Design a protein with these regions (language model features):
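Small/polar glycine-rich anion-binding or flexible loop at a beta-alpha turn
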Residues: 194-202, 219-225, 247-250
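Structural motif
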Residues: 15-19, 55-56, 81-84, 187, ...
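A hydrophobic, small-residue-rich beta->alpha segment in the mid-to-C-terminal subdomain
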Residues: 230-251
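Extended hydrophobic-aromatic, low-complexity segments
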Residues: 192, 208-213, 226-229
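Glycine-rich phosphate/pyrophosphate-binding loop at beta-loop-alpha junctions
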Residues: 48-51, 56-145, 218-234
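Active-site-adjacent helical/loop segments in soluble small-molecule enzymes
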Residues: 3-7, 12-46, 51-54, 130-208
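Single conserved hydrophobic/aromatic residue that forms the stacking wall/gate
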Residues: 252-263
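Structural alpha-beta junctions
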Residues: 9-13, 78-80, 237-240
Length: 264
């Protein structure tokens, strides 16, 4: 919508303009619920799934917003089996799902998936509230512990309510290998964040043996936004090329965004 100049002009006449909200803003999170409803409806329309058949959802996340939207969709009745939380090397969410303890007391790592470089996952508070039985006092206490001690732990009873979640992470090396392998196998190029999700999904299948459930991977960014990291992963020979040269490479078999095309 942000690239639709006709719609932008129409809104301008009416005195409105589009804006974007940070992922902590509930105004951004709630519309994301529609992503998963739409994806499910499209799978059903295309005959990929039967009516009421459950699917898995994989989301690359640092701030826990997009995957929380999937959680809300599931709670609203969308047939979702597993919510697969994919982290990069800043794996605070993976550790939380593995141990029940959220601990931000660790080194911050700069990765090729910068939108996920987060140690305080603000939207997780909303999930904690739900699994705490909507107990605002208990939720507040844990957030205060995070603020003062840098960590908090949930109870066994709360952990039991996370059975539908699976968490894992990929290293920088694994992320690059995922990009390269997918391109070599299919000719399709994904960005670094989507590669984290794809890599974690591979680990999920190995860990669980669940290879039959239809699965949606949320591709949260365009490879054109991270051309340097993406092309370095495919072949180091591209390292000497400029960013605009990388965008123009014919091996990227998807259309570049309109406004980027105008710049280049």
């Amino acid at each position: 919508m942000f690239n639709d100049t006709a719609l932008e002009a129409e809104l301008d006449v009416a005195g409105y303009q589009f804006s974007s909200a940070n992922s902590i803003n509930i105004g951004r999170l709630i519309p994301q619920v529609a992503y998963y409803v739409y994806a499910y409806a499209k799978l059903y329309k295309n005959g990929a799934i039967a009516k009421d058949e459950k699917i898995n959802v994989v989301v690359p996340t640092g701030n826990f917003g997009n995957i929380l939207a999937a959680f809300y969709a599931k709670n609203m009745g969308l047939p979702i089996a597993k919510l697969i939380c994919a982290s990069n090397e800043n794996k605070v969410l993976y550790d939380f799902f593995s141990t029940g303890t959220y601990d931000r007391n660790r080194d911050f790592i700069l990765t090729s998936s910068p939108s996920m470089d987060i140690l305080i996952s603000s939207n997780l508070e909303r999930l904690i509230y739900r699994i705490a039985g909507n107990d605002a006092e208990k939720n507040t206490k844990m957030m205060e512990e995070l603020s003062t001690d840098g960590k908090y732990a949930i109870t066994d009873e709360m952990r039991a309510q996370l059975a539908d979640f699976y968490g894992n992470y990929t290293s920088e090396e694994e992320t690059a290998k995922t990009i390269k392998k997918l391109y070599e196998d299919t000719g399709y190029i994904i960005d670094t964040h989507t590669a984290v999700a794809a890599g974690v999904y591979d680990k999920y299948k190995k860990d669980t043996g669940d290879t039959e459930t239809k699965t949606v991977i949320a591709s949260t960014a365009s490879p054109f936004k991270f051309t340097r990291s993406v092309m370095d992963a495919i072949d180091p020979k591209y390292d000497a090329m400029g960013d605009f040269e990388l965008v123009d490479l014919s091996l990227i078999h998807i259309s570049e965004p309109t406004r980027l095309r105008c710049i280049s």
